[in-house]
Curated annotation (Swiss-Prot):
The keyword ATP-binding does not apply. InterPro entries: Fe3_Rdtase_TM_dom, MsrQ-like. This is Protein-methionine-sulfoxide reductase heme-binding subunit MsrQ. GO terms for molecular function: electron transfer activity; FMN binding; heme binding; metal ion binding; oxidoreductase activity, acting on diphenols and related substances as donors. It is found in: Cell inner membrane.
């Protein structure tokens, strides 16, 4: 297995945050509504993992280090794990597993539908993020996994709908996502290594 320490570090970090948040909740450190805070943190964590996952290919392109690509799938699966925990937190802490209330919530809060669509997209990517699916799907596999950019848009829209009153934090994540998307435009993508190489030579 290549870069085992890098993989292990990501695994430890991926586990550490939810465990710490659960500890804070158990110790009564998250205020009067710990379930909502847990849900919000897990959702934000999923968005962060998604942005980090999308940054792996540009980082490999810029630095030439293959380790970024090696951990890309692992990061994507952590994003999915966090979004599953986010959904479970919503169902348990917010709805109290009241499935009848879930239908009411869908009608009252459209951002939940947006979030659900993002979850289904991530589910499709997680299920097919293996070599068997790559072989079976062939060229269609890459097309399917381009859905990640649609999922990013859905995640940012979901986040925007929730934090309508304070857009500062949202703007940071949206800006990072925008830069990552612009970098994937073919003319930009082709020029970035040249710019970095030129800068390196100048230095």
């Amino acid at each position: 297995m290549r870069y085992p320490w890098f993989r292990l570090a990501i695994f430890v970090l991926g586990c550490l945050f939810p465990l710490w948040w659960f500890y804070e909740a158990a110790m009564g450190l998250l205020g009067p509504d710990p379930g909502k805070i847990m849900m919000d943190r897990l959702g934000l964590g999923a968005l962060v993992f998604l942005l980090i996952t999308l940054s792996m290919t540009p980082l490999q392109r810029l630095t030439g280090w293959s380790g970024w690509i090696v951990v890309r799938r692992q990061l994507g699966l952590w994003c999915f794990a966090y979004i599953v925990l986010h959904l479970v937190s919503y169902l348990v802490f917010i709805l109290g597993l009241d499935w009848g209330q879930f239908g009411v919530e869908l009608r009252k809060r459209p951002y939940i539908i947006v979030g659900a669509l993002g979850f289904l997209g991530l589910l499709a990517l997680a299920v097919t993020s293996n070599r068997y699916s790559q072989r079976r799907l062939g060229a269609r596999w890459k097309k399917l996994h381009r859905l990640v950019y649609v999922i990013l848009g859905l995640g940012l829209l979901h986040f925007l709908w929730i934090v309508r009153s304070d857009l500062k934090e949202w703007a940071i994540y949206a800006g990072i996502g925008g830069v990552l998307l612009v970098m994937r435009i073919p003319p930009v993508w082709r020029r970035v290594p040249r710019l970095m190489g030129g800068r390196g030579r100048a230095a």
